[in-house]
Amino acid sequence: MPTAADIKNYTKPGVAPLYTYSAEIDTTPSATTPTWATICAGFDNIAEALNETVQQYFFLCGNGYPANYVTGIAPTITLSGRRIYGDTAQDYIFGKKYDLMGNRDTHFRMKRTDDAGTTETLISANVTLCNMTDISGATNDASACSVEVRFNGAPFQGDAWAS
């Protein structure tokens, strides 16, 4: 049974709902200075996958249990939601769906805003836009859309483009 002091001093653990996160995409990747468009309108789901390469070894001294080594990762951010025509970020992304090679390469950064209103850039990366779908769903619904933002090389923790 908790004491009165336990009740008075209770602190609820902090959580960060996904709406505290934001993402931006560079719509002029070949320019000297990025032109950032906020990825927001229409997207209602974001998921991170590290896509790890794990080497698993069962050494004699492990008594039948493995030793795991993460030897590589291919980070991907998947965004999905509803297609919004006229939105700068979505028009840029889905305007690339029939492009090949370097024409799908751009820059990406993800941020988070804390309870005090301070925004911090968590990661920034060179990316390739993959597996885009912007025509999908039932006839009475707004078209479902999705895109995979795949990192090229290691991401930078922070804002690589900060002045």
Predicted regions and their residues:
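Glycine- and charge-rich intrinsically disordered segments
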Residues: 1-2, 163
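Solvent-exposed edge beta-strands and adjacent loop segments
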Residues: 2-84, 126-143
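Short, intrinsically disordered low-complexity segments
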Residues: 7, 11, 81, 103, ...
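Short, surface-exposed linear patches
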Residues: 70, 99-105, 132, 150-153
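Acidic glycine-/aspartate-rich tracts in secreted/extracellular proteins
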Residues: 83-86, 154-156
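Short, acidic/charged, Gly/Pro-enriched secondary-structure junctions
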Residues: 90-126
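Short, charged, solvent-exposed linker or helix-capping segments at domain edges/interfaces
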Residues: 90-92, 157-163
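Short beta-strand and beta-hairpin "edge-sheet" elements
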Residues: 111-159
